[in-house]
Each structure stands twice: as C-alpha cells, then as structure tokens.
C-alpha cells in the first residue's frame, strides 16, 4: 500500500477496525457520495425501463425466441466485461476518471433509447451491446471515484448506498415501463428511456469534480499490473466471484420465466408481462434495501459472510424459478430472494476491491472485477438461455443453482485473501 491510501487494519472477523480518531470521525455520507448514488439511480431507471420491456419486445413484437434473448444479453454482458477490463487501468489516474464516467453514462443513455427504433433482433443486439460497452467504460471510473471519496472504514456503506441507488432505479424503471406500455406502447416507452440517463450524466459529473479536486494529479500505470494485484491478494477471490457470475442468470430470463408461468395460469400476454414487471420491481426494491443494510454488515463483518449469504439466497431462488406451474406467490418469493442476493453480492465484491488496493491501482482492480463479472454473465446468459429453450427451464435453472453452490463453497477465499492483502 502507498502512503496516499494506507490500509485499514483488519480484525479477526475480517472487518475494518478503527485506525485512529480521524478515521472514526470522518463523515462518509457527503454530497459527492450521494451524487454517485444518484447517477446510478437515474441511469438504472433508464436502462431498466428497457430491460423490463425487452423480453416482450423481442418475443412478441420481433418474434424472437428465449435463446435469442439470452444471446443478446450474453453478448452484451461479454462486451461490457471487455470494456471494463480494457478501460479499468485508464481510471487509475484520478483526473481521467471524470471523462470516462461522464462519457460512459452518456453513451449508455443514448444507445438505450435507440433500441426503440429496432425492427430486427440484430439491431436490438447492436444497440444493447453499445449501451453495455458504455456501461463497461464508466464502471471502473465511477467505483474508483466513490472509493476516493470515503474512508476505508466506510467502503461497505458507500458501495452499499451506490448499489441501493442502482437497485432503486431498477424499481423505478420497471414501474415506469409497466405503466407506459399500457398507455403509449412498447416503442415509445423505449424512446423515453433516454431521459433518466441524461440526469445521470449531470449527477456523476458533479460528483467526479469533487473527487478530482481532492486527489493529486499523478496516477497509476495505464495497464493492468497483475503482479501488484496478485500481491495484494485479489486474484484468488476472483474464483468464487466467477462461479457466482456463471450462475447469475440475466434478469430478462427471470422476467420471461415469470411471464410464461403467469400466462399458463390464465393471464393474457400483456397482463402477464405487466405483472411480471411489477414482481421484478419488488426484486429490485429488496436489492436496494438489502444493499444498504449489507454495506453496514460488510463494514462490521467483512465481505466473506455477506458473499456466502448471497450465493445461498440464489440457490433457493432458482429452485422457485425452476418449479413448473407456479403462481405469483412463488414467483414473488423467488424474485425477492434473488434481489436480496444481488444486493449483498455486489456490495461485498466492490468493498473487497476497494480494501485490497491503493487508489492508483483501483481502476485496474475494478476493471478486473468487472471483466470477471461480465465474462461469467455472458456464459450464464448464453448457456442458461440455450438450456431453457432446447431442454427446459428446469434444466437451465438447475445449472445456474449448481454454480451458486460452487460460489458458496468457495466463499472462504474472500476472507483469507482479505487478510493477506492487509499486510501488503
């Protein structure tokens, strides 16, 4: 670690312990921290409006299959991961982060809105991929900005708040979509998704300006320094993180499963789609609440137990999605468990990176994390979508649950590596 960002000591439980009076008294909930969370809220509102409508748009309007939906999501996730991995080192330099964050949020907003003009599946795939590439460009920069704004004692709470904002946007987006598609139709709803994204650009620009003023101009190398990242103890925990992401089914497939289950229960296509979107909003509401609470939990107990709990919740959730002939109560429980799981997992993973690395390496670290996440998401979306369409939804969700079990068993790597990283 450098003198610029000294490591906080770790207790036996893996939680960060007070390093001194200054660290204890330092406030963490500031305007810039709130601005980062607001950017996540507005951006997620926009692209989750599209995510909620996409299954019906592809399958009902463009007459595509579940495998096409999985392929679109999988390719987009894969490209987002490459963008995170490639641009993460560029975010090592504090004064470059603002441009990458603002530009990424702007690109996400514009490309998401353009999905509405698509008349073929390949066009949806292109615009979705462009939006997700922009998300990949912005993410390491945003996370590095956020880590630079708070004390190491408050990393969990800060990232929990950011994840809460993200998930609250994922509540507002589906709710807006559910109301808009019944009044103005699917395509106009897709067009309007650009508006919240533009608010996100303003919010992240203001937050980044504050972070830029508080850090020196000099930054880290413009490449991923795997040697330093390995010595910081961050490579081994990527194994259970990868297993988790290999089991992290795209939310569009969860919405599709709910829609089909509700249709089999007697609802029309439109009614089933609207109801499924509303249940998905509950998923995201729990994700927001649990992320905020989970951030405090991570600061007290460390990422390991929080991550393991997330994987366990997903195993149970996938059982609910796999069971055939289920009505809305079972689907609601399954969505709630999955939402809680993602709220805990993302907070734990981001906190792990922020604790392990100094500021001049965090862009690379967050890029590496994002690359692992997106590579796993690509494989999960593609494979589960194929199994879903060719064999059965039961097989697809059983496959995903198996990977979550692997992540649960491998969660011990997060604690061991965290302790090693503290000594560097």
Regions found by a protein language model. Give the residues of each.
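Helix-to-loop junctions at the C-terminal end of transmembrane segments
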Residues: 83-96, 181, 289-302, 388
């Amino acid at each position: 670690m450098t003198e610029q960002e000294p490591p906080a000591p770790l207790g036996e439980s893996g939680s960060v312990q007070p390093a001194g009076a200054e660290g204890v008294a330092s406030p963490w909930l500031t305007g810039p921290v709130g601005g980062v969370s607001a950017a996540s809220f507005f951006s997620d509102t926009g692209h989750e409006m599209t995510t909620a409508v996409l299954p019906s748009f592809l399958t009902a309007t463009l007459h595509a299959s579940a495998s096409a939906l999985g392929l679109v999501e999988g390719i987009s996730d894969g490209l987002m991961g490459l963008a995170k991995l490639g641009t993460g080192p560029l975010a090592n330099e504090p004064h470059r982060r603002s441009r990458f964050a603002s530009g990424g949020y702007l690109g996400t907003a514009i490309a998401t809105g353009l999905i509405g003009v698509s008349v073929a599946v390949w066009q949806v795939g292109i615009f979705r991929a462009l939006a997700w590439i922009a998300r990949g460009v912005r993410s390491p920069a945003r996370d590095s900005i956020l880590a630079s704004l708070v004390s190491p004692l408050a990393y969990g709470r800060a990232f929990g708040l950011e994840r809460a904002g993200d998930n609250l946007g994922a509540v507002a987006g589906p709710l807006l979509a559910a109301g808009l598609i019944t009044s103005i139709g699917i395509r106009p709803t897709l067009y309007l998704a650009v508006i919240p994204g533009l608010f996100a650009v303003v919010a992240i620009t203001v937050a980044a300006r504050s972070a830029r003023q508080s850090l020196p101009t000099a930054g880290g190398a413009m490449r991923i320094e795997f040697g330093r990242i390995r010595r910081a103890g961050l490579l081994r925990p990527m194994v259970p993180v990868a297993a988790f992401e290999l089991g992290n089914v795209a939310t569009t497939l969860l919405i599709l499963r709910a829609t089909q289950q509700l249709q089999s229960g007697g609802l029309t296509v439109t009614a089933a789609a609207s109801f499924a979107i509303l249940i998905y909003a509950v998923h995201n509401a729990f994700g927001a609440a649990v992320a905020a609470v989970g951030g405090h939990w991570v600061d007290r107990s460390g990422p390991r137990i929080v991550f393991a709990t997330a994987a366990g919740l997903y195993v149970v959730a996938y059982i609910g999605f796999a069971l055939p002939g289920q009505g809305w109560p079972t689907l609601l429980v399954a969505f709630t468990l999955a939402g809680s799981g993602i709220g805990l997992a993302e907070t734990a993973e981001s906190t792990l990176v922020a604790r392990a690395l100094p500021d001049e390496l965090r862009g690379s670290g967050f890029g590496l994390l994002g690359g692992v996440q997106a590579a796993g998401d690509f494989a999960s979306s593609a494979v589960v979508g194929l199994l879903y369409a060719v064999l059965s939804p039961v097989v697809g969700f059983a496959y995903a649950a198996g990977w979550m079990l692997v992540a649960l068993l491998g969660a011990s790597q997060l604690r061991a590596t965290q302790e090693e990283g503290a000594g560097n």
